[in-house]
Amino acid sequence: MSEVGTFSKILVAIDGSETSLKAAEYGIEFAKKYNTQLIILHIIHIHAAGLMYTTESTFKQFIEKNKKESEEWFNAISKKAKEQGIEIKTETVEEIYSVPGAIIKRAEEENVDIIIIGSTGKSGFKKLLLGSVATDVVRYSKCPVFVIK
């Protein structure tokens, strides 16, 4: 981790929601300002209970649909980043248990200096100040978290 006020590596977690895509724009701006590495991460949340009631082909379709969707987001974000002279690393992770836990784990593995995340995701609870994923990332992350409204 870098010293306070400087960044060498930034992780932005996205789910395709308006606030997460806005977070990616902030990530690009931070990466440009601080000349840092930028990682864009999407977690595919696999609901464990749903696995019991689905076929293998349906499960594969679900994963492929989500990967295709995330590739579209990554491509749009990459295009904006390249226009700013920023190279990014993109990653999709499949997670059965905890989305916030998966975000924090990747942040720790990558030794990032800051996580940028949207305040609310695709769950539809727009009236909440902070969604459950953002709340848990803020609560349990060892590095600073920048939450975008």
Model regions and ranges:
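Structural beta-alpha unit
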Residues: 1, 5, 79-115
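Small/aliphatic-rich secondary-structure junction motif
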Residues: 3-57, 80-82, 89
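Short glycine/serine/threonine/alanine-rich loop segments
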Residues: 36-37, 86, 112, 143
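Generic structural signal for helix capping and beta-alpha/helix-loop junctions
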Residues: 47-48, 98, 124
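A short acidic, glycine-rich active-site loop
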Residues: 58-72
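Gly/Ser-rich helix-loop-strand patches that form or flank binding pockets
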Residues: 108-149
